[in-house]
Amino acid sequence: MGAIHEETANRSPIPDGHQGAGDRAADHRHSARRAGRWPAPGGVCHFAGADQGGGVAGGQSRMGSSRGTAPRGLRASDGGTAGASSVHRQEVGSRRQEETGTQVMKTLVTAIQKGGQGKTFATCHLAFDFLERGLRVAVIDLDTQGNASFTLSAYQSGYLASQLFTGDTDDLRYWFGKREGESLALIAADANLANLDKMELSQAAAALRASVAALGEFFDVCLIDTAPSLGVAMTAAVLTADYMLSPIEMEAYSLQGMKKMVAVISNLRKQNPKLRFLGMVPNKVDARKPRHVNNLATLQQAYPQLILPFSIGARDSIAEALGEQMPVWKIKKTAARKATQEVRALADYVFTKMEIAQ
């Protein structure tokens, strides 16, 4: 079977050689194929420093951005991360683009070995936000629960996730070549994903890499949502991705899941050296609960270089938005405003770290 042996993964140390977050500017070159398709952003503005102690990033959110148009600018974080210990140093999302003269599609996977952490929330909201920036976005749902497929059902491409592992890349190119005008395309989860654990990991990873490479001819960004188990699908996705993001709740079981995931990342980066871990996103944080505050402090102490400099609060408006198949900034309630600021801050952070050209 293709899954990584958990005991072996957990013995792997985190690699040294941290590169400071945000120390490289994005490369805003266009390829000839993509030039002129979308308007470039009008400028760059900054959002205020974030509260590392479980609070919310400050600054104004982009309320009212219209779908399908690039906003006037994007906000780049002015905050750094705390110094990393020698044990837990990890390069955090600071990757120089290849000097090829073209802008290649960037691929991000959301993954953690624990369910209910917010992977689907992050995937869907990044997709909605990137769409508003004028990017062409492909979303791959590799979780048989299909929650991302539900929220993004209005953007069905008709191509199924299992076909990325079993189909022909020429067929994939033909399929999306006919639908090239679509700016957001969902590659939905299907029942056949359950059969992937019967595949050899090397075969599954090679097939997914080839399919994602073919998707790169039609999209600027590919976002992959994964199941919480370290099976063939998640492992193949991590071996394919350029970047990885791990939402995490502030509960004891979640912290255990993150410890496993950090070890797995170290192991898989040996096979996928281009992978950059953007960090852990503290999610569903309730500052009124002492255990959440204490667990966040524990995470920050254990992995100071890997915790994002802001958190997402425990807000019902986010769950409501996912159920209503829309981003939280479309929820017309006062309670959704704070959630909007937090989610926009996350999207800005990820966008900047992925060095996506517009």
Swiss-Prot record:
Signal peptide (UniProt feature, chain positions): none
Descriptive protein name: Protein IncC
Protein family membership: Belongs to the ParA family.
Cross-referenced CDD domains: ParAB_family (cd02042)
Biological classification of the source: Bacteria, Pseudomonadati, Pseudomonadota, Gammaproteobacteria, Enterobacterales
Classification via PANTHER family: COBYRINIC ACID AC-DIAMIDE SYNTHASE, P-LOOP CONTAINING NUCLEOSIDE TRIPHOSPHATE HYDROLASE
SUPFAM superfamilies assigned to the protein according to its UniProt record, in alphabetical order: P-loop containing nucleoside triphosphate hydrolases
Keywords: DNA replication, Plasmid
Pfam families, per database record: AAA_31 (PF13614)
Function: This is one of the proteins encoded by the trfB operon; it is involved in plasmid maintenance and replication.
Species of the source: Escherichia coli
